[in-house]
């Protein structure tokens, strides 16, 4: 039993030292949208933020794997978030997704204390529209 307790304690410590990746809810007007956020274990006190938008018919997981922003986050101590477009697309004709990205920025400032002077937007295909 003692070995099990020691092993469980060691696993807990190792898990706490690992980077955190979570789905976060972002309020946009009366609706709630999702963004996949990666926070490295060595995050700065007031980190930079990269917002990375996926292409049409893709999702945040795909965008994350293709861009490798998380590796840069691990090296530089910044935060990366991958918003999810409605129906895996972005609104190219209205302002809905502009408001979503603005809400993501404000949400990241509140939750993760990102430096609002170091927020960067990146996208692929329809996500770079």
Locate predicted features.
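Bacterial N-terminal signal peptides
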Residues: 8-15
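Short substrate-entry loop that stabilizes the transition state in hydrolases
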Residues: 43-90
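Alpha/beta-hydrolase fold nucleophile elbow
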Residues: 113-125
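Bacterial N-terminal signal peptides that target proteins for export
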Residues: 1-8
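Short, structurally constrained coil/turn elements
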Residues: 14, 29-31, 74, 108, ...
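Sec/Tat-exported extracytoplasmic proteins
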Residues: 35, 39, 54-60, 76, ...
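Alpha/beta-hydrolase active-site loop
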Residues: 93-116
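A domain-start/cap signature at the N-terminus of enzymes
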Residues: 3, 16-49, 61, 95-96, ...
């Amino acid at each position: 039993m003692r070995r099990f307790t020691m092993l469980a304690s060691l696993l807990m410590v190792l898990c706490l030292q690992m980077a955190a990746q979570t789905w976060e809810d972002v309020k946009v007007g009366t609706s709630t949208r999702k963004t996949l956020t990666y926070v490295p274990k060595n995050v700065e006190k007031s980190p930079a933020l990269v917002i990375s938008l996926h292409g049409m018919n893709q999702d945040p997981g795909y965008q994350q794997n293709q861009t490798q922003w998380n590796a840069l986050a691990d090296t530089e101590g910044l935060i990366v978030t991958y918003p999810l477009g409605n129906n895996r697309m972005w609104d190219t004709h209205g302002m809905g997704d502009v408001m979503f990205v603005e809400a993501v920025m404000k949400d990241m400032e509140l939750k993760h204390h990102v430096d609002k002077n170091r927020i960067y937007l990146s996208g692929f295909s329809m996500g770079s529209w």
